[in-house]
From Swiss-Prot:
Component of the small ribosomal subunit (SSU). Mature yeast ribosomes consist of a small (40S) and a large (60S) subunit. The 40S small subunit contains 1 molecule of ribosomal RNA (18S rRNA) and 33 different proteins (encoded by 57 genes). The large 60S subunit contains 3 rRNA molecules (25S, 5.8S and 5S rRNA) and 46 different proteins (encoded by 81 genes). GO terms for cellular component: cytosol; cytosolic small ribosomal subunit. It comes from Saccharomyces cerevisiae (strain ATCC 204508 / S288c) (Baker's yeast). The keyword Ribosomal protein applies. Keywords: Cytoplasm, Ribonucleoprotein, Ribosomal protein. Component of the ribosome, a large ribonucleoprotein complex responsible for the synthesis of proteins in the cell. The small ribosomal subunit (SSU) binds messenger RNAs (mRNAs) and translates the encoded message by selecting cognate aminoacyl-transfer RNA (tRNA) molecules. The large subunit (LSU) contains the ribosomal catalytic site termed the peptidyl transferase center (PTC), which catalyzes the formation of peptide bonds, thereby polymerizing the amino acids delivered by tRNAs into a polypeptide chain. This is Small ribosomal subunit protein uS8B. InterPro entries: Ribosomal_uS8 (IPR000630), Ribosomal_uS8_CS (IPR047863), Ribosomal_uS8_sf (IPR035987). Belongs to the universal ribosomal protein uS8 family. It comes from the Eukaryota. GO terms for biological process: cytoplasmic translation. GO terms for molecular function: structural constituent of ribosome.
Length: 130
């Protein structure tokens, strides 16, 4: 299997483990983008704790699942999103208003769409979680 993207593979592994009812999942390789994405998911309660394991290669992450995640995914290519267009993207990607988050990478870091709107920053769209 060819790797489309490290983040896409990690989120796909989380989705598959969640569907099969697993309590934890091992992600490898790891990257800073994956860790920041997981921090946003953890902040909103979609996953439990996660631990980075340094194996002197690319690293591994063990994620504890809590059963609250319905779906998470990557948007590829990473489209530029202006502040005014965030609402359109949330309407397209999320199943309902006030349900789930679109995750963006901005100049102020990786954050969800509500935080980006509060901080008044735009950026590129990474993915979604609900």
């Amino acid at each position: 299997m060819t790797r489309s993207s490290v983040l896409a593979d990690a989120l796909n592994a989380i989705n598959n483990a969640e569907k099969t009812g697993k309590r934890q999942v091992l992600l490898r390789p790891s990257s800073k983008v994956i860790i920041k994405f997981l921090q946003v998911m953890q902040k909103h309660g979609y996953i439990g704790e996660f631990e980075y394991i340094d194996d002197h290669r690319s690293g591994k992450i063990v994620v504890q699942l809590n059963g609250r995640l319905n779906k998470c995914g990557v948007i590829s290519p990473r489209f530029n999103v202006k502040i005014g267009d965030i609402e359109k993207w949330t309407a397209n990607l999320l199943p309902a208003r006030q349900f789930g988050y679109v995750i963006l990478t901005t100049s102020a870091g990786i954050m969800d769409h509500e935080e980006a709107r509060r901080k008044h920053v735009s950026g590129k769209i990474l993915g979604f979680v609900y």
